[in-house]
Amino acid sequence: MLSLLIRGSISIPIDELESSLHPDLFTHFLLSFLINSKKSQLIATTHNREILNNKDIFRNDSIWFTNKNESCATELYSLSDFDSSIIRDTSNVYNAYKIGKLGGVPNLGDYYIDLDNEK
């Protein structure tokens, strides 16, 4: 698949790109694509938040997050949508994401489940 992406002029969507890949192979695949591909586009989803540590690899407009709104509809927004006071060039995007500054984090609620007062 990588040779197809590098040689061709295509867009390929891949859901959960890191699935069944060693983390080093995942990073190697992305870097190989970014360095060698001139005309193709890779659109990938991931739950691998550690990828946010690689600020040197991705531009802010190439990282997108999803959030569920009150109507349970999925909203999509880019890292580049954030004000510079939230994300600066020197800030750690991974840490900003982990503490909830960027959204896209599930609302887990409490660990305790009260089965007696269940609605």
At which residue positions do the language-model features occur?
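GG-anchored amphipathic helix commonly corresponding to the ABC/SMC/Rad50 NBD signature/C-loop
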Residues: 1-14, 24-28
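Short His-Asn-centered micro-motif
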Residues: 14-16, 45-46
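Conserved D-loop-proximal element of ABC-family nucleotide-binding domains
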Residues: 19-23
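C-terminal lobe/lid and adjacent interdomain/linker elements of RecA-like ASCE P-loop ATPase modules
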Residues: 28-119
